[in-house]
Amino acid sequence: MGPTSVPLVKAHRSSVSDYVNYDIIVRHYNYTGKLNISADKENSIKLTSVVFILICCFIILENIFVLLTIWKTKKFHRPMYYFIGNLALSDLLAGVAYTANLLLSGATTYKLTPAQWFLREGSMFVALSASVFSLLAIAIERYITMLKMKLHNGSNNFRLFLLISACWVISLILGGLPIMGWNCISALSSCSTVLPLYHKHYILFCTTVFTLLLLSIVILYCRIYSLVRTRSRRLTFRKNISKASRSSEKSLALLKTVIIVLSVFIACWAPLFILLLLDVGCKVKTCDILFRAEYFLVLAVLNSGTNPIIYTLTNKEMRRAFIRIMSCCKCPSGDSAGKFKRPIIAGMEFSRSKSDNSSHPQKDEGDNPETIMSSGNVNSSS
């Protein structure tokens, strides 16, 4: 027993010491070929970094305004808007994390310990993972809300807490796996070229997870659209012409929103997914495209800038509130003004707009399912 226990202790100590060994960064970057690339093109990286940092600043400010809009507008203190707020928070952190990543890149990379390097890259994985999981949480909430509006209404505060908590817990675990041991510090031949301290198996695992998330989001939004179309056909069958035509308009608006959501998501993330798959399959120093990974990553980060536009600014009332925040106009009675400007007849609130952009759901239970998501609007039944 004695002789076998000594090597185990030594192995543990050496692995811990590796996390504070500055030479490991240089060794891994030299093995993958990124050491020479970064030395040869240091000036161009600085120029592109400035552009990328400006993009990140825009993303940060954009999402701060979204959070302020939700916080200062009482009518947005509902579960669905909390999901949008969580998405804005994760997108904001993605912008902050990528800015820090850029500032700590280049020559600064070789002054980092492996532990600091894992924190630099892990923070990006956590923020981007939280953003993607937030998109999935919004899709789940919209789908469940539609089903509950057909069956029965109940409190969804627990579901709100559960989904948001799961979003961050899973993201933290996913981003923390390399620093917890799933890395290639002691296995150079298994190292990623894009991220030289990450194991290729970890890269493949993350790519698989994100691909499954994308498929889940696609399936959920297709199911939402299918439910709306089913409702529209049912109204047509009952010869309820006014409701059927209104439902048909909402279905078309919903279809456009679904196409926008999925197209933007795929356009931003698919190139990075493909690059990471190439990283897993290519042998070291054989795929030159892997040395241009920053352009693929910034495209994924751009999704954090498009999310506020898709999920909030297409909502008419959120757009108005957003403009009020930007113009620094304090409207204490702004939340209740909309209620008194519309006549209330027989317990029903009528919107002045004939479009589906209003986020006030009609009291008619038959119309509720279609108002869940139309033209970017999101409403909760809570």
Swiss-Prot record:
Residues 350-382 are annotated as: Disordered. The modification Phosphothreonine is found at residue 236. The keyword Glycoprotein applies. It is found in: Cell membrane; Endosome; Membrane raft. GO terms for molecular function: G protein-coupled receptor activity; G protein-coupled receptor binding; sphingolipid binding; sphingosine-1-phosphate receptor activity. Endothelial cells, and to a lesser extent, in vascular smooth muscle cells, fibroblasts, melanocytes, and cells of epithelioid origin. Residues 351-366 have a biased composition (Basic and acidic residues). S1P-induced endothelial cell migration requires the PKB/AKT1-mediated phosphorylation of the third intracellular loop at the Thr-236 residue. Palmitoylated by ZDHHC5. Palmitoylation is required for targeting to plasma membrane, enabling G(i) coupling. Residues 371-382 have a biased composition (Polar residues). Induction: By the tumor promoter phorbol 12-myristate 13-acetate (PMA) in the presence of cycloheximide. The modification Phosphoserine is found at residues 351, 353. GO terms for cellular component: cytoplasm; endosome; external side of plasma membrane; intracellular membrane-bounded organelle; membrane raft; nucleoplasm; plasma membrane; presynapse. One of its GO terms (biological process) is positive regulation of positive chemotaxis. Residues 69-82, 139-160, 225-257, 311-382 are cytoplasmic. A lipid is attached at residue 328 (S-palmitoyl cysteine). Residues 1-46, 105-116, 183-196, 279-289 are extracellular. G-protein coupled receptor for the bioactive lysosphingolipid sphingosine 1-phosphate (S1P) that seems to be coupled to the G(i) subclass of heteromeric G proteins. Signaling leads to the activation of RAC1, SRC, PTK2/FAK1 and MAP kinases. Plays an important role in cell migration, probably via its role in the reorganization of the actin cytoskeleton and the formation of lamellipodia in response to stimuli that increase the activity of the sphingosine kinase SPHK1. Required for normal chemotaxis toward sphingosine 1-phosphate. This is Sphingosine 1-phosphate receptor 1.
